[in-house]
């Protein structure tokens, strides 16, 4: 009975270590996404982190102002944003900044003239 318990525990640990890969996340990568980065580039600032595991609790290692830093993560809805093949002729105008700004299943996606709420691409 003891050997069976040890084998079961070993199998559970092996499967558990593969869960991030199965669900599309790297080991140490936290749930959620990075907030939109609309700030100007600060090229002389060194990265404050390289991966999520270096950030406290609910923060993720994200690009902000062209360098990586620990920032509060945002929720991300399922699906991917559709490709936009247009070029913008007017000033950039963001109608949203994160998925939670959009109703229902819509995602906050980059478009030719800024970000707006769109239905996820089918695929």
Curated annotation (Swiss-Prot):
Residues 1-24 form the signal peptide. It is found in: Secreted. GO terms for biological process: antibacterial humoral response; innate immune response. The keyword Disulfide bond applies. Its main location: secreted. Keywords: Disulfide bond, Protease inhibitor, Repeat, Secreted, Serine protease inhibitor, Signal. Gene3D superfamilies: Elafin-like. Pfam families: WAP. Putative acid-stable proteinase inhibitor. PANTHER family: WAP FOUR-DISULFIDE CORE DOMAIN PROTEIN 5 (PTHR19441:SF39), WHEY ACDIC PROTEIN WAP (PTHR19441). This is WAP four-disulfide core domain protein 5.
